[in-house]
Amino acid sequence: SSDLRNLAIRGRKIIDKVIRHVEYARSEINAIGDYYAYAKELADGDAVFDFDVTKLSIFTRSLGLAGIEVYDLLRDEYDIQTEFGDIANLLAYVSIGDRPKDVERLVAALAEIRRNYRKDPSKTLKMEYIDPTVACGPQDAFYAEKESLPIAETCGRICSEFVMCYPPGIPILAPGEQITEEILTYIRYAKKKGCQITGPEDMSIQRLNVMTER
């Protein structure tokens, strides 16, 4: 196709243009204040091997807003569709079809969101990852006798189903893991901020399935 031919002939030049747009956006967003657009400094050769410079990932918690809240504001108030937001970050892609004025529009919208919607960052949830406490194997937990309890009564019990927060879609709980107050706080916070909770039988997340105690 003509698109493939164009990429084969001018691919390097096209990607270099995208990278310039993203680097400009990254610099301008960091200059706004309260946002942090991640860059190559994350790549330490250990925990982070490399960094995709074409992705614009922005930390929003210092703004007092979850990434999903900024995502919703961009979509609803500014007609800007980004990739996704979670409880602390926003992800935007800059494509080969984006123009400098598209990048400027995103930067301007983020600056206006900071002016108009900034909140107290001390009220945001600080944890993004919780180390699981594994009490038994997932297969044993999944097929064990179970009961459904109100979520407030599940602390200390062993979960028998998956609970995932989208985005990013990584399990908060898996069968065989112990439910802690920290995990329950995370679930409530993510739900309040507008993240979609998937996996449990009760999609309203009012109840959770846990292993029956013997």
Give the label of every model feature segment:
Residues G11-V22, L56:
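Substrate-binding/catalytic subdomain of NAD(P)-dependent oxidoreductase enzymes
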Residues E23-G199:
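Conserved C-terminal alpha-helix-loop-beta "cap" of PLP-dependent enzymes
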Residues Q196-R214:
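Charge-dense polyanion-binding interfaces
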